[in-house]
C-alpha cells in the first residue's frame, strides 16, 4: 500500500480588542488584550483548524464553525481544534503533524512555547509545533493592531479507513 500524504496551509487573522481575554496557542495570556472574534479568536488554534480541515478537503473554519452556527459562539480554540481533528479522522485520515507560526509583537510566545505545544498536541492527538515571528514593525501586526497565525498540516489516508 502506498501512503499518499495531503498537505494544506491554514491562516487566521484577528484584531486586538481591549478588555477581552487573550487566548493564543491554547493558552490564556493574563494582562494582554484579547482578539476580536466569534469564538476566542485564538489565531494559532484557528490556523491549525483551517490547515487540518483543508488537508482533508473538509472546507475551512468558517464553513465548519462559522457565525451561522451559534453553538460555536465563544468556543475555545482548543475545542475547535479538537473537533476539527475529530472530523478529519472521521473522514478517513490520520494526522501526521501540524506546524503553526504566530506573527505579531505580543504576546511573546517563546517563554511558553513548550506549554502551548503540549496543549495543542493534546487537542490534535498528534505533534503540533509552535514558532513565532515579528514583522519588524511592518503591517498591522507590526503596528500592534492584531495577530496572524499560519499553519501547515500533514494528513494521510488512515490504513484502516
Swiss-Prot record:
The record marks 38, 134 as: Transition state stabilizer. Its cofactor is a divalent metal cation. Pathway: Isoprenoid biosynthesis; isopentenyl diphosphate biosynthesis via DXP pathway; isopentenyl diphosphate from 1-deoxy-D-xylulose 5-phosphate: step 4/6. GO terms for biological process: isopentenyl diphosphate biosynthetic process, methylerythritol 4-phosphate pathway; terpenoid biosynthetic process. CDD domains: MECDP_synthase (cd00554). Homotrimer. Keywords: Isoprene biosynthesis, Lyase, Metal-binding. Involved in the biosynthesis of isopentenyl diphosphate (IPP) and dimethylallyl diphosphate (DMAPP), two major building blocks of isoprenoid compounds. Catalyzes the conversion of 4-diphosphocytidyl-2-C-methyl-D-erythritol 2-phosphate (CDP-ME2P) to 2-C-methyl-D-erythritol 2,4-cyclodiphosphate (ME-CPP) with a corresponding release of cytidine 5-monophosphate (CMP). Binds 1 divalent metal cation per subunit. A divalent metal cation binds at residues 12, 14, 46. It catalyses: 4-CDP-2-C-methyl-D-erythritol 2-phosphate = 2-C-methyl-D-erythritol 2,4-cyclic diphosphate + CMP. This is 2-C-methyl-D-erythritol 2,4-cyclodiphosphate synthase. Belongs to the IspF family. Signal peptide: none annotated. InterPro entries: MECDP_synthase (IPR003526), MECDP_synthase_CS (IPR020555), MECDP_synthase_sf (IPR036571). It is an enzyme of class 4 (lyase). The gene is ispF. GO terms for molecular function: 2-C-methyl-D-erythritol 2,4-cyclodiphosphate synthase activity; metal ion binding. Transmembrane segments: none annotated. Its EC number is 4.6.1.12.
Amino acid at each position: 500500500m502506498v501512503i499518499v500524504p495531503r498537505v494544506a496551509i491554514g491562516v487566521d487573522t484577528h484584531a486586538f480588542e481591549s478588555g477581552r481575554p487573550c487566548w493564543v496557542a491554547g493558552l490564556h495570556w493574563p494582562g494582554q488584550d484579547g482578539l476580536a472574534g466569534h469564538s476566542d479568536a485564538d489565531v494559532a488554534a484557528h490556523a491549525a483548524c483551517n490547515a487540518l480541515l483543508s488537508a482533508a478537503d473538509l472546507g475551512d473554519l468558517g464553513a465548519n464553525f462559522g457565525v451561522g452556527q451559534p453553538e460555536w459562539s465563544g468556543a475555545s480554540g482548543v475545542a475547535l481544534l479538537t473537533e476539527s481533528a475529530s472530523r478529519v479522522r472521521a473522514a478517513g485520515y490520520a494526522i501526521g503533524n501540524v506546524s503553526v507560526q504566530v506573527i505579531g509583537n505580543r504576546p511573546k510566545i517563546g517563554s511558553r512555547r513548550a506549554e502551548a505545544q503540549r496543549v495543542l498536541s493534546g487537542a490534535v492527538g498528534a505533534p503540533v509545533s509552535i514558532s513565532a515571528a515579528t514583522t519588524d514593525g511592518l503591517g498591522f501586526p507590526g503596528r500592534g493592531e492584531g495577530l496572524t497565525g499560519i499553519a501547515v498540516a500533514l494528513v494521510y489516508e488512515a490504513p484502516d479507513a
